[in-house]
Structure formats: C-alpha cells, structure tokens
Regions:
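Active-site neighborhoods and metal-handling regions in enzymes and metal-associated proteins
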Residues: 1-474
Length: 474
C-alpha cells in the first residue's frame, strides 16, 4: 500500500502527542497502526483502516507501522518498501517526507523495533494498547508478553491492562474526549458529505424500488466526495431491526424507510439517521409517532451542555417519548414512574447515543473505560443497560442523539419484559395495534457540546416531517 503524508500540518500531531504526554507523564509509548485483514486469502484484503489511536497521533494510514516515543522524541518503525512495490502499488512518499509531515524525528525499519524498545527501558516499562488486527496483536504479544485475549475489546467492561497500559488508556481517553480544531473540521466535512448522501437517498426513494438502490445512491455521494461509509449503512423498511445488515427488499407504498448512514473522511466519522415515508407522505399514525420521536430528539439535544451527565440526556429523551406514548394512549401512568420502571424501553431499548470521533462509537475498543466515567457502571435495567456513554459532557465533545420508537417482536412477545406492564394495564395493546404501520423510527443527529447552546452539526439534513416529505421523490 502506498503511504501518503497526512492532510494536516505536522504541528497538529506534535500538539496531540504533547497533550498525551502531559496527561500520561514520562512513560514511553508504542502504538500499532495494524495490518490489512484478508477477506478469503492473503492477497485479497478488506480496505485498510489504521487503528484510531495511531491515526490520531500521526494522521497516516500505514499498514504494519509502529509509533514509539516519549516526550518530544518520537519515531515510526515500518517495513521498508519492496523493490517491486512501485510496480503494484504506485509511488509512495519517501520516509524523510513522511517524517517531516508527521513531525517525528525518524522513520526506521521495523526490524529495529525490538532494540529500540530495550533502549526505552524494555517492554515492562513501556505503555501500549491492544491492537485490533490479529497480526499486530501477535506482534504485540511477542514483544510485550501482555496477557490479552482475543475479545478484550468487549463493550461491557474495561479491557484488562497492565499498569502502564492502563495509564496510557486513561491518558488517551482524556485527550480524545474533546476534539481539537483539525478534528472538528474533518467531522464537519464528513457530515457535509453525509448530507449529500441522505438527500440523494430521499430523492431516489419510491414504491417498487429496492432498499439497495437507495443505499447505492447514498454511498455514491460518499465515494464521489472522497469519503467511505463510516460503518455498514442501514437502509431498511424493517426499521425495528436495530442493526439491520440487509437492503434487499422492495419498498412499498405505506412503508417507512429507516436510513442510518454516515460518511468517514480522513478517518473521522459522522453518524446520522433519518426516517422517511416511501410514498412521500406519512400516514396519520406514522406522523404522530414521528413527531414524538422528533420531539425526543430536540429535547435531548437541548440538554447537551458542559457538566451535564449524558445519562440525564438519555433520560430526557425517555421522558419525552413516554409522554408522547401516554398522550397516544399506548402507555398509562405517571411519566416519571413509567421511566423509572423502564416502560419506555419496550419501544426504545437502546441508549440515546455515544461519543463520535475517529471511531463512529469513539474509543469503544477500550470498552466501558472510555464511555463510562470513573465510578460509573452499566445499569442492570433492560434498556438503560445498553447506554454506551455515561460521562459528564465537556466543551468540544461530539455525541450522537438518536432516540427511536420500534415495534420489536422479540420484545413485545417476551413475557419477562412485557408481563409486568400487561398485568397492571400500563401497556395498552389494543391502542398499540393502531400503530402497526410504524415498524421503526429513529432520528439521529451529531451534536457538539459548546460553552453555551449545543451545536447540531447535522442540522442541515432535513428532519422536520414536512421537510422530509418534500425531499422524497414520490
């Protein structure tokens, strides 16, 4: 793979490494870029994506490279190009050019890494983070003898790390939680491309077409503007399937199309969901539920301010949604009591959002260590237990706000979840049946926390009901 200098100037990466060192102290650090993963044989690989911690500090997608250093002294270790690389892969920047662009002192052959680690005090004194790619993980194991398992990046817990590695993880989290100007510029650029994609998808939507045609229109805009999908796009009339991987169905009049699609630009992600009527017009029940979800989105966004606990942002969305369900006669009871009991989670089972940055779920490779503040752990309550983020918000954090309403058979047919609400009359199934044409609605925005009112970075992507209908081709 050809390696190119980063888009930004070296001062961006020098500043980030200095902030990391200020948070960490004088521990030496090694971070791995990772390797391409094969699809079905060694030479047929998935598109390469550098590990985000390496990318954050270098701006460079460099397969197999390792960043090593401390203080202001940093080097990159990489495999020298093969004699025929230019034939197959094209010209690559010289190592001197790359070193200057990244702001490191030198780039050296990967074979010299082991001796360099010894020069920095040895593996026991050096901090690193678990690599994602299997080959890099094996390389780390050989160099550092760390006791990491294959599934240490579990969402529901902290990755077990040595003392130096744990210190690095906490320092990296503290630096990456709030974004610098260069990061925000890339996120804004990704969202602008996402805006184009969603408008293209809306314009192509009509009864009789397939979901994959809409997905292709969206992702064409990503490609045409130098971006890639930040994750597997969800484009589905089965909006009740939260992480639907399939887009093969034909769209019919009366369907709602849920589209969760975001562009990634220079490694920085966006994450936006809109839901629109295939026929170009909401039915009365669809419109009623859409407006409830939209109000939950608006009310939660308004809570995105410095010092506010993100769990409270989630609970605000839950209260607004529950109030709407009570108004529609689907639930009965006191709003706060219903939320405390988790009645809303029958229809809104996931958390209201997550961190956004280089990763679409930023830093989730570090598990709940990144998403949950010190002393905070996941709730055991259904619904609230899926909340990915429970930190106090700070200026220049970017989070998603994505409430939804879903009619999920696996939930609504589960006596252990619905039984208490059926028995005491809280859940009014006869009234709920009137909303059978609402399979799933989600409205998601990317929001920057500022010193004042929140900045909705994705505000230009239509979400008011009439604005959405006006964009649909039908």
């Amino acid at each position: 793979m050809s390696v190119y200098p980063p888009i930004e100037g070296s001062e961006v990466f020098i500043a980030r490494r200095r902030r990391l060192m200020a948070a960490l102290g004088e521990l030496p650090v090694a971070l791995f870029a990772g390797d391409p993963s094969p699809r079905n044989y060694a030479a047929n690989v998935h598109p390469y994506r550098a590990h985000s911690h390496f990318l954050y500090l270098t701006g460079t997608a460099w397969p197999g490279a390792v960043l090593l250093g401390e203080g202001d002294e940093w080097e990159i270790f990489a495999t020298p190009p093969a004699p025929d690389d230019a034939l197959w892969l094209g010209a690559s920047a010289t190592w001197d050019t790359l070193a200057a662009a990244i702001g490191v002192q030198a780039i050296r052959p990967l074979a010299e890494l082991a001796d360099a680690i010894v020069a920095h005090g040895g593996a026991a004194a050096l901090a690193t983070l678990p690599a994602i790619h299997p080959r890099s993980r094996a390389q780390q194991a050989a160099l550092f003898a760390r006791p990491w398992g294959l599934h240490d990046e579990s969402l529901h817990g902290a990755v077990p790390l040595s003392e130096p590695d744990s210190a690095l993880a906490e320092a990296m989290i503290s630096v990456r939680l709030s974004h610098d100007a260069a990061a925000l510029a890339h996120i804004r650029g990704a969202i602008q491309i996402t805006h184009r994609g969603h408008l293209a998808g809306m314009a192509l939507t009509s009864p009789g077409r397939r979901e994959c045609e809409v997905r292709a229109a969206i992702e064409r805009e990503f490609t045409a503007h130098g971006a890639v999908p930040a994750y597997g796009s969800i484009v589905s009339v089965a909006g009740e399937i939260l992480h639907n991987e399939h887009s093969h169905q034909h769209m019919r009049a009366g369907d709602l199309l849920l589209v969760d699609a975001g562009a990634e630009l220079h490694g920085w992600a966006s994450d936006v969901t809109r839901t629109w009527p295939v026929s170009g017009k909401f039915s009365p029940t669809q419109r009623a539920m859409y407006d409830i979800v939209l109000q939950a989105n608006i009310d939660a966004i308004d809570q995105v301010r410095p010092g506010v606990r993100y769990r409270d942002v989630h609970l605000q969305a839950c209260r607004t949604l529950t109030r709407g369900l009570v108004d529609e006669g689907i639930l009965r009871g006191d709003i706060d009591n219903l939320v405390e009991r988790g009645a809303h989670a029958l229809f809104f089972p996931h958390g209201v959002g997550h961190l956004l940055g280089l990763d679409v779920h930023d830093m989730e490779d570090l598990g709940d260590r990144a998403g949950y503040g010190p002393g905070r752990v996941r709730s055991q309550q259904f619904g609230l237990g899926y909340l990915r983020l429970d930190r106090d918000l700070a200026v220049d954090m970017v989070v998603t706000i994505e409430p939804g309403f879903y009619l999920v058979p696996a939930i609504l047919q589960d006596p252990s979840l619905c039984g208490p609400f059926d028995r005491d009359g809280t859940l009014q199934r006869e009234r709920l049946a009137a909303f059978a044409d609402v399979r799933g609605i989600r409205i998601e925005d990317d929001v920057r926390c500022t010193s004042g009112a929140p900045e909705v970075l994705s505000a230009e992507i239509p979400k008011a009901a009439q604005a959405v209908m006006d964009c649909v081709s039908a």
